[in-house]
Amino acid sequence: MRILLIFCYFLIFTLCFSCGESPNKKEENNAKEIDASELKNQKTADRKVILFFGTSLTAGMGLDPNEAFPAVIQEKIDSLNLPYEVVNAGLSGETTAGGKNRINWVLNQKVAVFVLELGANDGLRGVPLTETKSNLQAIIDVVKEKNADTKIVLVGMEIPPNMGEAYTSEFRNIFPDLAKKNKLELVPFLLQNVGGIKELNQPDGIHPTAEGQKILANNVWKVLKPVISK
């Protein structure tokens, strides 16, 4: 009888201990999951936005979004543990006029760095150079008005000589002129070492392949890295 009582006490103690332990472990695991989720959200919230505003070259037309040069730059940023989040606002076929019309909508978030890549489609369509330059200036003005602390990187472009030597030359000069006037960082030529190289472009001969996009990323990174490392 005594042995039976001892066994019963042992059984009750074991059951009570077991029943009390499971909820604690469950709560502990839930707390850990919540903490991890909050930490991830906090890290995202703490990251400053780099907004890439451009054409199909920025959007990565014909490729997976992760192969576009802004995404490649995000990988470079992450490898250095820099607190920045890339937002790709590239749009295929975008002109400076189109960019001017949508800039206010795009700037509905706080932007630390604004990378402006527009003008190529204007040049290919023969848009008057004064109009292209005016539209780019208007976009720059809006960015500065929204937040004077936003750093702006202007991406230079060149076009084939189809429109004539004078037009081509003046088009090229738009970007350094605007960069100097507004004290912006300038990427001299986005398609450097990619434009006109068959194996680095898709069949249309205009849009870079994934390998070409990596070179574009390097071209931009040379200018962008010092800006976000300060």
Predicted regions and their residues:
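A generic secondary-structure micro-motif detector
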Residues: 2-5, 63, 92, 129, ...
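A short beta-strand-loop structural module common to alpha/beta enzyme folds
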Residues: 82-95
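Conserved Rossmann-like nucleotide-binding pocket used by diverse enzymes
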Residues: 15, 87, 153
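Alpha-helical cap/lid subdomain in secreted, periplasmic
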Residues: 100-230
